[in-house]
Amino acid sequence: YPADFNFVCPTELEDLANLYGKFQAVGCEIYSVSCDTHYVHKAWHDASERIQKIQYPMLADPTHCLAKEFEVYIEADGVAERGSFIVNPEGKIVAYEVNAGNVGRNADELLRKVQACQFVAEHGDEVCPAKWQPGAETLKPSLDLVGQL
């Protein structure tokens, strides 16, 4: 996320905090990362009731190494873009989303994407259509489906 003490970030991080148990229930860990220092994270935590709800790790990237590695660093501003990355157990990025700095992300949708990524990892011959939810029908790609959807 771009930075501590701004406007959209606390709403996103609180949204994740509210669903943290659901992410853990599906075997997913959350890490929030900004280019701030851990001292700034601590000050923000102490000052904000929203941030005090957070139980997941808040990582500091003051050298911008992680932001650069994920290709979300904005050199001119010294901050990261607003990005979410789903990394599978093998360490491969299987889904990502990068939003404009003034548009917040949705934790419910991120959880749905995590579950969809887990489903297709377990069922390699099936895909999850738009708005797929756990338990809903999936698709099995085949020549028979071409032009039928």
Residue ranges and their predicted role:
Residues 1-149:
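Chalcogenol-based redox active-site neighborhoods
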